[in-house]
């Protein structure tokens, strides 16, 4: 207990000496953060031992001491990296290397020379907001090389130059949505107006009014596809319409008016032909009538009900008169009979029991014929040939599926073809240094759970060379299962955002 208090007092004394000396060197700033790290470790150890006070200093919770120690370690690493650059001999104060300055916008950058920027909304002096523009900004590129750049302000926002690009870290249009009623603001630097009131309707090329790049790129493509009248395009559209019609399942089919004259012609033939030929035409007519529209089916249903009532009376006559009555039935007017009645007339003289069974099984026989027609070998082969499951995946379909592959595919080939439509990736957004550190850790810690990492990159405005938003990085995977395993195991750094996506090729 006493030794721990003595060590803590020694660290406090060393910190006081650093504050009194106020040296403006990187070496002094590194020593300052190393001392803060030792202090946090001492307080953490004291809390573990159940000590609540070290002298007059209360011991904080373990989580607080741990966070302070990690923060000090991170700042030491950044300052040691800056010490190896060409800016090590510049003057660096405690304010320049503090966490408050380092984490202010633009985040995770060393900055010097704050300049106040006042933005007045709706021409109201009381409705104003203050921002900080930094004269110099120090950033590290993708090759871990430090650069020094200047910062500026315009009607869009406050930015710093990343090479030749303008990287905005403050956008006035974002705050205008909250503070402004008319969407107008005025920019003042050091109490001097540098930009007169402007509206929030900025041009599409600027970051404040940037439109969705996918919308501008997809619109002409859709128009071209719609106006293309080449024979190849027409044949493809016709095939797609046929495939779409077959996938409707049991939906309503369009009524085919061209089949009615053909059906009428077949009926007229069945009236004039013999008893055997009428049976053949009656089955064809029944099959054709089954696939008519709903209105035609209603009319035929009524006709069937009338034919059944007529057939019952006729069957009674056949039972009374024997075989001679069936001969009289064939000599009657053809307009009273359909092809279905001619088929029923063959069984009227065979006895009462068989006649009853034939009448009751008429509906089931019709359903069996309908089922056999829909599941015929030709139709099943035709659907199987046109099904994309057995045709493979065309280049235009790769990456277009939005849902993950389910368990409906029993074969391995079908699952591989479905997964080929959606090569999975993860888009990570954050600070460039944070993303690079995360990439280096993930390569060793999560080996085998990913395919590859990309370098950091940024989006550029449509009509300019200004960088938009934070840095990006892509993580590719071999399949959706690998991406899910990676997402379950990985722990992203603080402030890093991610989203799912897919690409046509990697």
UniProtKB/Swiss-Prot annotation:
Localization per record: Host nucleus
Record SUPFAM superfamilies: E2 regulatory, transactivation domain (SSF51332), Viral DNA-binding domain (SSF54957)
Region (DNA-binding domain): 422-506
Region annotation (Disordered) ranges: 196-406
InterPro entries reported in the protein's UniProt record: E2/EBNA1_C_sf, Nucleotide-bd_a/b_plait_sf, Papillomavirus_E2_C, PPV_E2_N, Reg_prot_E2, Regulatory_protein_E2_N, Regulatory_protein_E2_N_1, Regulatory_protein_E2_N_2
Positions with biased composition (Basic and acidic residues): 379-389
GO CC annotation: host cell nucleus
Stretches with biased composition (Low complexity): 196-229, 275-297, 310-339
Gene Ontology biological process terms in this record: DNA replication; DNA-templated transcription; regulation of DNA replication; viral DNA genome replication
Compositional bias of kind Polar residues: 232-243
Post-translational modification: Phosphorylated.
Record Pfam families: PPV_E2_C (PF00511), PPV_E2_N (PF00508)
Keyword match Phosphoprotein: yes
Function field: Plays a role in the initiation of viral DNA replication. A dimer of E2 interacts with a dimer of E1 in order to improve specificity of E1 DNA binding activity. Once the complex recognizes and binds DNA at specific sites, the E2 dimer is removed from DNA. E2 also regulates viral transcription through binding to the E2RE response element (5'-ACCNNNNNNGGT-3') present in multiple copies in the regulatory regions of the viral genome. Activates or represses transcription depending on E2RE's position with regards to proximal promoter elements including the TATA-box.
Subunit structure: Binds DNA as homodimer. Interacts with protein E1; this interaction greatly increases E1 DNA-binding activity. Interacts with protein L1; this interaction enhances E2-dependent replication and transcription activation. Interacts with protein L2; this interaction inhibits E2 transcriptional activity but not DNA replication function E2. Interacts with protein E7; this interaction inhibits E7 oncogenic activity. Interacts with host TAF1; this interaction modulates E2-dependent transcriptional regulation. Interacts with host BRD4; this interaction mediates E2 transcriptional activation function.
Assigned protein family: Belongs to the papillomaviridae E2 protein family.
Protein name, entry field: Regulatory protein E2
């Amino acid at each position: 207990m006493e030794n721990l208090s003595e060590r803590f007092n020694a660290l406090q004394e060393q910190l006081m000496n650093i504050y009194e000396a106020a040296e403006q060197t990187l070496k002094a700033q590194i020593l300052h953060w190393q001392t803060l790290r030792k202090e946090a470790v001492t307080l953490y150890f004291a809390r573990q031992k159940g000590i609540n006070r070290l002298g007059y200093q209360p011991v904080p919770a373990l989580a607080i001491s741990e966070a302070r120690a990690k923060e000090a370690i991170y700042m030491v690493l950044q300052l040691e990296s800056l010490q190896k650059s060409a800016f090590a001999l510049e003057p660096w104060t405690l304010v320049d290397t503090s966490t408050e300055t380092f984490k202010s916008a633009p985040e995770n950058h060393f900055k010097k020379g704050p300049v106040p920027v006042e933005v007045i909304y709706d021409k109201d002096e009381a409705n104003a907001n203050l921002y900080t523009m930094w004269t110099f900004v120090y950033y590290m590129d993708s090759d871990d090389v430090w650069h020094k750049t200047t910062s500026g302000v315009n009607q869009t926002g406050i930015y710093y130059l990343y090479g030749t690009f303008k990287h905005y870290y403050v956008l006035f249009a974002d705050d205008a949505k909250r503070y402004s009623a008319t969407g107008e603001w005025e920019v003042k630097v050091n109490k001097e107006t540098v930009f007169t009131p402007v509206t929030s309707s900025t041009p599409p090329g600027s970051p404040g009014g940037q439109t969705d790049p996918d919308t501008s790129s997809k619109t002409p493509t859709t128009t071209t596809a719609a106006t293309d009248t080449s024979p190849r395009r027409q044949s493809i559209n016709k095939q797609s319409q046929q495939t779409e019609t077959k996938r409707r399942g049991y939906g309503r089919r369009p009524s085919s008016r061209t089949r009615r004259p053909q059906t009428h012609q077949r009926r007229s033939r069945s009236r004039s032909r013999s008893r055997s030929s009428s049976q053949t035409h009656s089955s064809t007519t029944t099959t054709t009538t089954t696939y008519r529209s709903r209105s035609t089916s209603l009319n035929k249903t009524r006709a069937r009900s009338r034919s059944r009532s007529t057939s019952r009376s006729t069957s009674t006559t056949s039972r009374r008169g024997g075989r001679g009555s069936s001969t009289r039935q064939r000599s009657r007017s053809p307009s009273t009979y359909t092809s279905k009645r001619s088929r029923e007339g063959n069984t009227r003289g065979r006895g009462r029991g068989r006649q009853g069974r034939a009448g009751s099984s008429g509906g089931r026989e019709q359903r069996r014929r309908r089922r056999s027609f829909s599941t015929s070998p030709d139709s099943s082969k035709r659907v199987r040939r046109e099904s994309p499951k057995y045709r493979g995946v065309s280049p235009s379909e790769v990456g277009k599926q939005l849902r993950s592959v389910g368990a409906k595919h029993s074969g391995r080939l079908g699952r591989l073809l479905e997964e080929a439509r959606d090569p999975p990736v993860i888009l990570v957004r954050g600070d460039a240094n944070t993303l690079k550190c995360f990439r280096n850790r993930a390569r060793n810690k999560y080996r085998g759970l990913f395919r590859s990492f990309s370098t950091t990159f940024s989006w550029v405005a449509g009509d300019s060379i200004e960088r938009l938003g934070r840095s990006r990085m892509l993580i590719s995977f071999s399949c959706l299962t690998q991406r899910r395993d990676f997402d379950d195991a990985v722990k992203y750094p603080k402030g890093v955002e991610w989203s799912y996506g897919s690409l046509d090729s990697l």
